[in-house]
Amino acid sequence: METETKQAKAIASKVSIAPRKVRLVIDLIRGKNIAQAQAILTFTSKVAAPVILKLLNSAVANATNNLKLNHEQLYVKEVFVNEGLRLKRIFPRAKGSGDMIKKRTSHITLVVALKNKQILKEAQDGSENQS
C-alpha cells in the first residue's frame, strides 16, 4: 500500500531518561504529521518532551537539507526507544549496607518520511470532515 522511499533519520544516544518514561511521549507522536507532532511535544509536560522535540526538528532538518524534501509533506514514520547503559550507584542503607540504584539511559531513534499523494489526499479529506 504505502511506498515511501525517501526518509530521514535522527538518533539521540545516551539520553539520561529512563526508556519507559520516553515511551509515554513517543507513543503520542507516532504516525502524526510534523506540525501536529511539534504542537503535541510543545505542550506535553513530560521530561522527555523537549528532547524528542529537538530530535524531531533534527530529523526534519536532515530531510529538508540532505534530501530536499518539503517539510509540510513529512510525517513521523517510526519512532522507538532502546535501552542504553545502566549506571550503577550505591544508595546507603542501615547497618552499613547499601542498595543498588540503576540509572537508566535511552537511545531514541526517529524516522520521518514523505507521504505519498494518495495518503495525503485521504488525510486532507479526513481533516475537512472533522471540522
Curated annotation (Swiss-Prot):
Keywords: Ribonucleoprotein, Ribosomal protein, RNA-binding, rRNA-binding. CDD domains: Ribosomal_L22. One of its GO terms (cellular component) is cytosolic large ribosomal subunit. The keyword Ribosomal protein applies. It holds the Pfam family Ribosomal_L22. HAMAP family: Ribosomal_uL22_B. This protein binds specifically to 23S rRNA; its binding is stimulated by other ribosomal proteins, e.g. L4, L17, and L20. It is important during the early stages of 50S assembly. It makes multiple contacts with different domains of the 23S rRNA in the assembled 50S subunit and ribosome. The globular domain of the protein is located near the polypeptide exit tunnel on the outside of the subunit, while an extended beta-hairpin is found that lines the wall of the exit tunnel in the center of the 70S ribosome. PANTHER family: CHLOROPLAST 50S RIBOSOMAL PROTEIN L22-RELATED (PTHR13501), LARGE RIBOSOMAL SUBUNIT PROTEIN UL22M (PTHR13501:SF8). Part of the 50S ribosomal subunit. This is Large ribosomal subunit protein uL22. It comes from Phytoplasma sp. (strain STRAWB1).
